[in-house]
Amino acid sequence: MSSPYFCNHLCVVSVCNMPPNKKKGKGKKEPKKGAKKPAVRKPLTLKQKQRKESKVVRADSLNWKPVEIPDNLESYEGLYGIEELDGVDVKYVDGKAEFVVKEEKKDTKKEENENEDKNEIEDEDDEEEFTGFDDPVTETKRPSDEPDLKSKKKQKPNKDDELRENAFVGVDASLPKDTDLPKWSMENVSLSTYTINGLAGCGFKEPTAIQRKAIPLALQGKDVIGKATTGSGKTLAYGIPILERCLAQLESKTNTIKPPTAMIFAPTRELAHQVVDHMNKIAKFSPLAQNGIVSITGGLSIQKQERLLSHGPSILVATPGRCLELMEKSVDLVNRMALTDMIVLDEADRLLQDGHFEEFEKILDMLNKHRPKKTQGVSRRWQTLVFSATFSRDLFGKLSNNKPRNKESSFIENDEILSLLNTKLQFRDRTPAVIDANPKEIVSGKVTEALVECGPSERDLYLYYFLLMYPGSTLVFANAIDSVKRLVPFLTNLNIPTFSIHSSMIQKQRLRALERFKAAGEKNQTAVLIASDVAARGLDIPNIDHVAHYHLPRSADVYVHRSGRTARAGKEGVSVMFCSPQEASGPFRKLRKLVADSANKGSRMNMHSDVKLLPIEMDLVTQLKPRVNISSKLANSTISTVSTKKSDSWMKEAAEELGVDMEEEFVDDHLRKQRLRDDNKILTKDQAASLRAELKSLLNERLRINKRRSYLTSGVDNLAHQMLTGDSHEAVWGHAKVKALDQLKKGKSTKKSK
C-alpha cells in the first residue's frame, strides 16, 4: 500500500498514442531509456519541522519574567521572587533538562512586497517611455497624486486605537441654540456650555438644595459628605462636578490608555445602570465618546466589560463585587484605577454598613497600595464624595429587636457623621465638608404616609382594594421573594398589569421588567411592580404615584429608601403600609419613633399622630372577597405546580448522579409533607377552568357602592349625575374618581365607613 504522501503529491499522466503534430504545445524530449528518474522529495514531518525551527538554549540566557503577586493572595504563603517563561519547551535527554526555543522567522513578506512594488513601477515607466504615435497632449497626474490602494489599507484607522486614545475626543459636539439657565449660576461656579445644554435638555431649570450646596465645593476639589432626602437630586450633585473635571482634562490624542477620572460605587446593579443613564443624558452634548461612561456590574458579560475597560473610559460606575473580580484578574487595571482623581460612594451607608460589602473595603485597600506616592500631576490621595439619605446608627437596627434604644435622638450631628465615616474612609481633607440639605427630615416632606390596619391573612384583599380604588403607577414591596412570586399571578388574574423584580432574577430579566414598568408609567397606564428590597435604594423610576409596603420593612432605613421611590423631582406621592395588629404594637411603633420629625423629640408620641389611616369602604371590601379568594386559589395552584416540578427534577438528577433508584421510602419526611401540602393546592385542569370562568364573570360585573339604593338619582352624589359628568369611577358605580393623595389630604374621618 502506497504512502499517503505519495498519493497526495505524485501525479501520473498517461499520454495516448497521438501524432506529435497534434499535441498541444511544443514537444518535449523524452528521457532516455535507462536514465535515473529524479528523486521525489518527501515533505517534512511535524517533528522534523520542530527540530529545524528550534534550538537548545541555556537556562540563564532565557527571557525570564517576574510574576506579579495579586494583593488578594498576599505573599503566596511565603514564596517570593517567582519568575515565569513563555514559549519554551522542556526536553529531558539522559536525565538532563534542555530548554528548546523556537527561532524567530525572518519576515520575508515585506521584502517580497517591496520587490513587487519596484517591478510594477519599472513596468509603468517602460510603458510611459514609448512615444511612437502622435496622440493629443493631455495633462497627466503624477504617480504620487494617484490614490494608492495599498497605502490606503495601511492607513486605515483601527477602531480599538481610536477608543483607546481617550474617552473624550477633540471635536466639538453639535450644540443646540444658546440656552440660558441663570439659576444654575452659583457662587464662584460657571458650568460649561456642554453641561448647561445637557441640563436644559433634561428639563432641570434650577438646582435642588443639595446640588446648590455640594457642586461648588466639589468643583473646588474638596471632600464632600452630602445628606439629603430621597429624590432630591444627589446623582447630579456629584455627576456635574465629575463631568466638569473630565472636560477640564480634555487633551490631544495619545496612544496610552488613560486612567479613569472618577469611579462611582453603588450597592445595587440597578442603581449603577441608572447612574450611567443619568450621566449620559447630562453629557449628551459634550465631546464624550460612546464608551466614555461604563458600568461594571454583575449579571452581564465579564468579557465585554474587560474589552470596554481596555479602551480607557473616563467614568466608571461599578458594584463592588464585579469590580473586585476584574481587579484581581489584572494588575495593570489596578494600577490604572489607582490613578483616579475622584471616588464617589452613592448610598454610602449601605456600602459601609458592618457585615456588608467586604469587597468594597478590599478595593480601597488595593487602590491605596498601588497609588503612587510621588508622581507629577497625581495628588497623594483622591477626592472623595459621599452621598446618602440615611447616616444614623439606629436606623439600621432590626425593628423586631426588643433591646432598649438609645435615648438620644435618631438624628445625628455632623461630628457623628464624620466619626462614622472616618473609621471606614481616609479623606484627603482633614475636615471634609458636611452638607445636610434636610436636617429635620428623613422621609421627604412631599411623601404623605398612610396606614391600613388589616389581619395577616387579609393583606391580599386590602392590597387589591387599594389598587382598584386608586389606579396609577404603584410600587409594592414585600420582604420575601416567595411573596413577590405569588403576588404576580394573583394580581394578573385580577386583570391588573403586574411586573416583578427580585434578587433571584438574572440581570437582563430585571432590566426588562423595569423598562416595561417605566413604559407603562410614561403612558399614564395602571401598572404594578412587585419588588423585594433590591429595588428600594436609589432607583429613579418616574411617575410613581404610590408605594405600598405589603410587609412592614425589617429596619427603618429600608422604610426610608422604600418611601423615597415616590415623590421624586419635586412631585408628591403616597406611602401606604399594610399593618397587622401584632406589628402595630411593636415594630410599627418603633419605626415611627425612629422616623418621626425632630419636633416630636422627647414628647410622648401617639402612634397615629403623623400617619393617616386610609379611608376604607367596607361595603366594597365585602364585594371584592369572592374575586380575591378565587384568584388566590389559582395563584397558589400555579406556584405549587412549578415548585413540585422543580423538586421532582432535582430529585431525579440527584438519584441519577448517585446511581440509585428513587423510591418513596427514601424521601425525607419533611419533603413528603411539603409535597403533600403542594399537591393539595394544585388544581386539576377542569377545576382551574371552572374557577377562571367564575372569576371572569365576577370581573365583568361592575361594583356598585351601597347596593341597597334602588334608584339612579338617590343620594347626594347620585349615579345619574356622575354618569353625565364623567366623574364616575371606572370600576365602581356610584363612586367618584378620587386620588389617594387627595383623599388623605381632605382629612376625612379615620373610622372605617360601614
From Swiss-Prot:
InterPro entries: DEAD/DEAH_box_helicase_dom, DEAD_box_RNA_helicase, Helicase_ATP-bd, Helicase_C-like, P-loop_NTPase, RNA-helicase_DEAD-box_CS, RNA_helicase_DEAD_Q_motif. ATP binds at residues 228-235. A motif (DEAD box) lies at residues 346-349. It catalyses: ATP + H2O = ADP + phosphate + H(+). A motif (Q motif) lies at residues 184-212. Residues 119-132 have a biased composition (Acidic residues). The keyword ATP-binding applies. Residues 21-40 have a biased composition (Basic residues). Keywords: ATP-binding, Helicase, Hydrolase, Nucleotide-binding, Nucleus, Ribosome biogenesis, RNA-binding, rRNA processing. SUPFAM superfamilies: P-loop containing nucleoside triphosphate hydrolases. GO terms for molecular function: ATP binding; ATP hydrolysis activity; RNA binding; RNA helicase activity. It is an enzyme of class 3 (hydrolase). One of its GO terms (biological process) is rRNA processing. Its EC number is 3.6.4.13. Transmembrane segments: none annotated. GO terms for cellular component: cytosol; nucleolus. Residues 103-118, 138-150 have a biased composition (Basic and acidic residues). ATP-binding RNA helicase involved in the biogenesis of 60S ribosomal subunits and is required for the normal formation of 25S and 5.8S rRNAs. Belongs to the DEAD box helicase family. DDX24/MAK5 subfamily. PANTHER family: ATP-DEPENDENT RNA HELICASE DBPA, ATP-DEPENDENT RNA HELICASE RHLE-RELATED. This is ATP-dependent RNA helicase MAK5. It comes from Meyerozyma guilliermondii (strain ATCC 6260 / CBS 566 / DSM 6381 / JCM 1539 / NBRC 10279 / NRRL Y-324). The gene is MAK5.
